[in-house]
Amino acid sequence: MRSGVIAQKVGMTRVFTEAGEHIPVTVLKLSNCQVLGHRTSEKNGYVALQLGSGARKTVYMPKAERGQFAVAKVAPKRKVAEFRVSEDSLIPVGAEIQADHFVVGQFVDVTGTSVGKGYAGGMKRWNFGGLRATHGVSISHRSIGSTGGRQDPGKTFKNKKMPGHMGVDRITTLNLRVVQTDVERGLILVEGAVPGSKGGWIAVRDAVKKPLPKEAPKPGKFKVVGDAQAVDEDKAPADTPAEKEGA
């Protein structure tokens, strides 16, 4: 199981195929996505990679957080997240994951925070049908109607679908196809819509319900930056070259 990446949503556009068909795509940008630390089964009880992306000022950053980035010898990051991986998919601390970590044609799962829509009624929030347009209904055409019974049960049950705040939820969209990658600019173009607004942070992983392509690099495509911990040749997995460039 490979690591995912932290990307930033740029917006939507379209690309054309050789046959002239256009494909709607969402542009995701990798902003110096680097490895900050390892989580091992011996110390933490599970195996994972801690990644960071984006730039952050240290003016109001607590010393404890600054110390974590100093230990990893990485510039402070705006967004930090963990990705579960297998033991043979660990990437050196400080390495920067590149856009060709994903190959064209493979499927990915994306997770983001949906756009906030404020206080919404039952018809918009839960797709209720509303009340009748005529025959005695006045003003309350878009209301949800009764929310409970009579004397029995004599109450409104918990979790009843009602008007309220809509959006700003953690949403995962499965099986989006990678249409194109741009290593120089750090761009990943995926087919379809991605949850969240422009500038929002998106977690991109290999699809769990689709097979991983054989040409996908393992443990990933990365480059060692600065004083990153290089993989020893004796300890490196069989599919991990101990070079400056990742697999």
From Swiss-Prot:
It holds the Pfam family Ribosomal_L3. Residues 140-164, 212-247 are annotated as: Disordered. The modification N5-methylglutamine is found at residue 151. Disulfide bonds: none annotated. The keyword Transcription regulation does not apply. GO terms for molecular function: rRNA binding; structural constituent of ribosome. Residues 232-247 have a biased composition (Basic and acidic residues). One of its GO terms (cellular component) is cytosolic large ribosomal subunit. InterPro entries: Ribosomal_uL3, Ribosomal_uL3_bac/org-type, Ribosomal_uL3_CS, Transl_B-barrel_sf. GO terms for biological process: translation. The keyword Kinase does not apply. Keywords: Methylation, Ribonucleoprotein, Ribosomal protein, RNA-binding, rRNA-binding. One of the primary rRNA binding proteins, it binds directly near the 3'-end of the 23S rRNA, where it nucleates assembly of the 50S subunit. This is Large ribosomal subunit protein uL3. The gene is rplC.
